[in-house]
Curated annotation (Swiss-Prot):
Residues 1-27 are annotated as: Disordered. The lineage of its organism: Bacteria, Bacillati, Cyanobacteriota, Cyanophyceae, Synechococcales. The keyword Hydrolase does not apply. Transmembrane segments: none annotated. Residues 1-10 have a biased composition (Basic and acidic residues). GO terms for cellular component: ribonucleoprotein complex; ribosome. Keywords: Ribonucleoprotein, Ribosomal protein. It comes from Synechococcus elongatus (strain ATCC 33912 / PCC 7942 / FACHB-805). Residues 11-23 have a biased composition (Basic residues). This is Large ribosomal subunit protein bL34. Belongs to the bacterial ribosomal protein bL34 family. It comes from the Bacteria. One of its GO terms (biological process) is translation.
């Protein structure tokens, strides 16, 4: 059996695409704004 090739790490995930990471940059804030206006249940990871 082949081993799993994608084993994500939560720290990396939060640091790159978490809410606070999004709020750090102008484009990230735009992402949050777009997701808010769309009515997403989850704004960030």
């Amino acid at each position: 059996m082949t081993k799993r090739t994608l084993e994500g790490t939560n720290r990396k995930r939060k640091r790159t695409s978490g809410f606070r990471a999004r709020m750090r940059s102008a484009t990230g804030r735009r992402v949050i704004k777009a997701r808010r206006s769309k009515g997403r249940a989850r704004l960030a990871v």
